[in-house]
Amino acid sequence: MKLVCIECGKSISYDHFSYHCECGGLFDIVQDFHNHDAEQLKHLFNERLSERMTPYASGVWRYKELIFPELPEECIVTKHEGNTGLYTHQLIQDYIGLRQIYVKAQSENPSGSFKDNGMTVAVSHGKSLGYKKFTCTSTGNTSSSLAMYSSIGNSDSYIFVPNKDISMNKVLQTIAYGAHVFSIPGTYDDGIEFLEKYSEDLGLYVCNSINPFRIEGQKSIIYEIAQYLNWNLPDWIVVPGGALSNATALGKGLHDLFTLGLIDKLPRIAIIQAEGASPFHQMIDKKMKELIPDGSPYTRASALNIGNPPSWKKAKHTLKETNGITASVSDIEILNAKAIIDRSGIGCEPASAATVAGLKKLVDQQKIDKGQTALCILTGNILKDTDALKEYHSGDNMVAIFKNTLQATSLDYKTIQNYI
């Protein structure tokens, strides 16, 4: 394993860790898979499905040979993350109009979001280097995940959250896990800039998506999907686009699976952004070479409220390698899609629902054929943003087409009989 700059190609050892190359580029992790046999790996991964109390009970560390083979087992900080549900539901299928749709509920992770898949690897790597203080800037899910893993690993976490346009549910979860939480003026992007400048001097290990070990852990999402589907993936993988680490990780994981011969074709990736925070989609749609940051992004889907996604270059490479596409969706499209996902019994936070909303739009626009198959990644739990539930079902929003209201009634048989 080595770290290679995506800009200039310089490589460094993983135990001489840095987030940025001297040229300013981000590092990517390059693994050597030449000695792996696909059938032996399948057998090993299937055997580990029966693990219960070891690190390999984790839906991330089950694939340790493809994620961080050099890491000593005693350095693994895990809460048996992963192992999340893969579902189909007729309501979602009818809403989108596609032949076959899966949803991967990363919302079932221990802290309630997909961030756990990457955070277990980042914190474990930091521990192996001797770090005791971990940090991130976050609109919510990264912070609660980091706070949880830091506490499990008997370390401290220092979290920077914007002072507006965030979900207080996520902040309260982070506080409850014992993190030192700082409410800052400005945006997620301002927090990233601060940590890039000062984290090393402060002795802090950064766990944002600029950390390539986060990406390695998040690859496990697509590994797990492939294993559950007997190594036969759908035509499309649909993912929400905020910081773009998840899209990057899924693309990298697909490349690994294809290179190893574990799958025989690459699915196409669709990255969905919210209209109010869609600089990556705008770049792709307008065929621009560089991303133009949005200095004042806003979307009700707070996890997508990022105007300068740090992983955009890696995500652009993912689109190129998978012949992928992008789309943007309005907040009301997101919230209506969320209502369908919730009503199916699966549930998710608003940002997750961007995948279903985006897939519906792409099918309606005939960019995805109705005869194809797709899988939507649901990134966060339904309880991550209860304010969104209140606004949708209790507010005066006339375009909330799946509103379900609380009904006040007297407790007598005939009245209840009329409702039923």
Positions of predicted regions on the chain:
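PLP-dependent amino-acid enzyme catalytic core
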Residues: M1-I420
